[in-house]
Amino acid sequence: MSKFVFVTGGVVSSIGKGIVAASLGRLLKSRGYSVSILKLDPYLNVDPGTMSPFQHGEVFVTEDGAETDLDLGHYERFTDTAMTRLNSVTTGSIYQAVINKERRGNYNGGTVQVIPHITGEIRERIHRVAANSNADIIITEIGGTVGDIESLPFLEAIREFKNDVNRNDVAYIHVTLLPYIKTSGEIKTKPTQHSVKELRSIGIQPDLLVCRSDKSINEALKKKLSGFCGVNINSVIEALDADSIYSVPLSLKKEGLCKETLKYLDLEDKKCDLKNWEQLIHNLRNPGDPIKVALVGKYIELGDAYLSVVEALRHACIEQRALLDLHWVSAEMIENNSAETYLNEVDAIVVPGGFGNRGVNGKISAIKFARENKIPFLGLCLGMQCAVIEWARNVANLPDASSSELDPNTPNPVIHLLPEQEDVVDLGGTMRLGVYPCRLTKNTTGKNLYDEDVIYERHRHRYEFNNYYKQSFLDSGYKISGTSPDGRLVELIELENHPYFLACQYHPEFLSRPGKPHPLFKGLIKASQDKLTQSN
């Protein structure tokens, strides 16, 4: 039977609950426990699939095709465990499910209310993850901040949850902020005291406090927090600002987070094996020469919009003992100036996914610059589509080529809508989503990188390479190095006589892990290193 850990946050938003939950998952897994982590998000959207990246950051796609919060990416990367659509719950999806049940008559004419129906549905979702994953420990992160109106149904649900299980089957962790007042030279505990008071008023007594701070917390402060918040002093956990999110599990291990959590769950504190993780941090802190990577996108004002891409680059650099020197380049700025202005000094170029017209011509110019100047290049999803358009216009003698998404009237739609998408009306959850197989072509860079005949990658798209133009592309020097098993969909393309030029229709960034970088990102960094070595 599963045990349950609930992670709440107080004082401020973006306090780091997701990293704490993911780090605890890593620590538990290092002790031999199986873990699944879910996120309860308090917004009314059914999922983040149609939300602006500027507001929400990236949409993380699970194996089974769910469009989820970016925190699920942290969960997967830290625990190396695949999550499913069950691991992402929003207020919108809860209300949708309850209203659908009411319309079907499931409540037998009863009055449908927040308590018990909404809170009951939330509890059922948590139990469903436990039943589906069969994990030893289920960690649940509650989005938002204690005191927010939006989070109240979730907090009430996790309060009720302790009545569903034995008391030693559940633990509550509260992540909070201890601000340092520079003028007085003091760390203040009052905001945390009030946050815990608010949590208690709901009926939840936290078992552990994880205290975010940029200054070390002494024993006197821990004792004060213990007394005012009703938490054992050993369960007051210091969480200092870290040089990398990947070093957080090690610092929380040192503070005893996992040990104390297991104590509340009445589980054995097994021997912890973090040798590989410690080696990862050693490599991260002792890199070799820098690699200047330009990420050419349209949402660069918010780095979280490309979170998994950045982490995948970081994983590859750690593996290759390189220092990631990331250059954020606005595709629109390239449109207004020139690619050379922004890309002349970089060692590699990445064009990630996206939607819509804005910035597309800048991306195409960046790809042309990478191709002509032999700069290692990797295109992802829309990045592949832009690479196809660039080749069609500048090499394959189709100067008016485009995508039917960008120009519905283009005479040469080298990228077109997938046939199964033609009658789709709704935007949310209707794309080609989740894991699909890709058969690799022999004697290609792609095949050599993966060293597999068939790979499985995550997708999120409506548009695809138009096979009507396949032969003209092949005749002009393009190589198709990966397709769907039936050969209908082009998944991976590359160029010969180039240090590294690959583009894929899928999203490899979602499968990259610290210590296990994705082959396409590792290949990009290695090619950049090789090119630098040759030039020196």
UniProtKB/Swiss-Prot annotation:
Assigned EC number: 6.3.4.2
Catalytic activity: UTP + L-glutamine + ATP + H2O = CTP + L-glutamate + ADP + phosphate + 2 H(+); L-glutamine + H2O = L-glutamate + NH4(+); UTP + NH4(+) + ATP = CTP + ADP + phosphate + 2 H(+)
Pathway named in the protein's UniProt entry: Pyrimidine metabolism; CTP biosynthesis via de novo pathway; CTP from UDP: step 2/2
Binding site for ATP: S14, I15, G16, K17, G18, I19, D71
Binding-site positions, L-glutamine: G354, L382, G383, M384, Q385, E405, R462
EC top class, as a word: ligase
Domain Glutamine amidotransferase type-1 stretches: 292-534
Chain sites annotated for binding CTP: S13, D148, I149, E150, K188, T189, K190, P191, T192, Q193, K224
This protein's UniProt keywords: ATP-binding, Glutamine amidotransferase, Ligase, Magnesium, Metal-binding, Nucleotide-binding, Pyrimidine biosynthesis
Active site: C381 (nucleophile), H507, E509
Positions of Mg(2+) binding: D71, E141
Location of the region described as Amidoligase domain in the Swiss-Prot/TrEMBL record: 1-267
Record InterPro entries: Class_I_gatase-like (IPR029062), CTP_synthase (IPR004468), CTP_synthase_N (IPR017456), GATASE (IPR017926), GATase1_CTP_Synthase (IPR033828), P-loop_NTPase (IPR027417)
One GO term (biological process): 'de novo' CTP biosynthetic process
Any further remark recorded for this protein: CTPSs have evolved a hybrid strategy for distinguishing between UTP and CTP. The overlapping regions of the product feedback inhibitory and substrate sites recognize a common feature in both compounds, the triphosphate moiety. To differentiate isosteric substrate and product pyrimidine rings, an additional pocket far from the expected kinase/ligase catalytic site, specifically recognizes the cytosine and ribose portions of the product inhibitor.
Family of this protein: Belongs to the CTP synthase family.
Subunit structure: Homotetramer.
Full protein name: CTP synthase
Source organism (scientific name): Prochlorococcus marinus (strain AS9601)
Gene name in the database record: pyrG
